[in-house]
Amino acid sequence: MTNITQNQKITVVGAGLAGSECALQLADMGYSVVLYEMRDKTMTPAHKTHKFAELVCSNSFGSLGEHSAPGQLKWEAKKLNSHILQAAFEAQVPAGQALGMDREVFSAIMTEKVKNHPNIEIRNDVVKSLNDIPRPAVIATGPLTHDDLAESMRQHFGDEFLYFFDAIAPIIDADSINTEIAWKADRYDKGTGDYYNCPMNKEEYNRFIEEIQKARKIEPKDFETTDFFEGCMPIEVMVDRGPQTLRFGPMKPIGLDDPRTGRYPWAVVQLRQDNKEGTAYNMVGFQTRMAYGEQVRVFRMIPGLENAEFLKLGSIHRNLFINSPKRLNKDLSSKNDPWLFFAGQITGVEGYFESTCTGLMVSRFLNQKLKDQPFNPPPRESAFGSLLEAITDPTRAEHFQPTNINFALLPPLAEKERDKTLRKEKQIAIARNVMEQWNP
């Protein structure tokens, strides 16, 4: 396949975040892309629309902070002209220091981008076997891969998939929020006051925890164990770890002074704007597997949400992922088939934007391979390079678990820096310097 030209068709399976990004990047390079998306014919347990790059869990890409690891990942993606990032800013809604989006506007933008690109052919069909698609190919089918294709992949790799469960938080009608109790503010008054905050005193919190414990839960079917990713942990699982866990997690009150009392309450439930019109808010960090009726009953105990109208209730679904350090090469191609690439959450990254970045990287790696260029990965010191290392380092294979971007993935400084803030600033400076020099 060394004589492949720019006219060679590339198959991308899955029009989620990673697949859409990868397809657009390859198409921009002049390649003809055939993009498969099954949701016109077969829906997943979590998706609600047929649009591309649908956001099924949170509506946030995480921090934009200049000295945060997620912020650095976005800085690098912007330098590489990420289509997903551009669309996110076009669909941006107020979310403090995070990049929040109107999920419908965002998906509509991405769908139009993909459908209108002259080098992309869309096929609304279900791919059931790796043998059905020509190479080169990119599999970006996500954690909710069709069962038949998942079985084909299992046979290809010769071992079982790994899996974990994650959960989706409810969305509330803004008009049903009691603004005499809930107030708008960002933590420590940073930002423009984009979050509604629902306060609880100690007695209210304790009763709330008791009702979460009593509530009927939806248990996953057909599995003996239930592993949850830490970043999408259901609140009832957190409560099982101890009654105060929520107070030090999604309900931490520090930096949120209740205007009625002048000090921060015992606990706080935060609501983040979910659409551009500001008519819908999601419950931050409130992923849940409680039964629907129980969610309504328990969440209406929250001060400010006594009469809450739920536009969407929380749910749970299973996520599949490959043991990438064991089964994938550094360029995210299969060790069993060098022209079969993988991108997105199925590679073991966790998070919308991390998934996007793997799609962006695969587009560069595939381009290098098609042009017979040496493999040129992003520098190890960069956020992109650190994320890639986390999912391809063979030493991680035995205990591999999904990861999102964080400072622990970046290499330590050559000279130890005791000050945590300065240490992070120096790591960011190094990452930016090496990315400025990288020419993929």
UniProtKB/Swiss-Prot annotation:
FAD binds at residues 14-19. Its main location: cytoplasm. InterPro entries: FAD/NAD-bd_sf (IPR036188), MnmG-rel (IPR002218), MnmG_N (IPR040131), TrmFO (IPR004417). Its EC number is 2.1.1.74. GO terms for cellular component: cytosol. It holds the Pfam family GIDA. Disulfide bonds: none annotated. It is found in: Cytoplasm. Keywords: Cytoplasm, FAD, Flavoprotein, Methyltransferase, NAD, NADP, Transferase, tRNA processing. Its cofactor is FAD. Gene3D superfamilies: FAD/NAD(P)-binding domain. It catalyses: uridine(54) in tRNA + (6R)-5,10-methylene-5,6,7,8-tetrahydrofolate + NADH + H(+) = 5-methyluridine(54) in tRNA + (6S)-5,6,7,8-tetrahydrofolate + NAD(+); uridine(54) in tRNA + (6R)-5,10-methylene-5,6,7,8-tetrahydrofolate + NADPH + H(+) = 5-methyluridine(54) in tRNA + (6S)-5,6,7,8-tetrahydrofolate + NADP(+). GO terms for biological process: tRNA methylation; tRNA wobble uridine modification. One of its GO terms (molecular function) is flavin adenine dinucleotide binding. Belongs to the MnmG family. TrmFO subfamily. Catalyzes the folate-dependent formation of 5-methyl-uridine at position 54 (M-5-U54) in all tRNAs. This is Methylenetetrahydrofolate--tRNA-(uracil-5-)-methyltransferase TrmFO. The lineage of its organism: Bacteria, Pseudomonadati, Bdellovibrionota, Bdellovibrionia, Bdellovibrionales. The gene is trmFO.
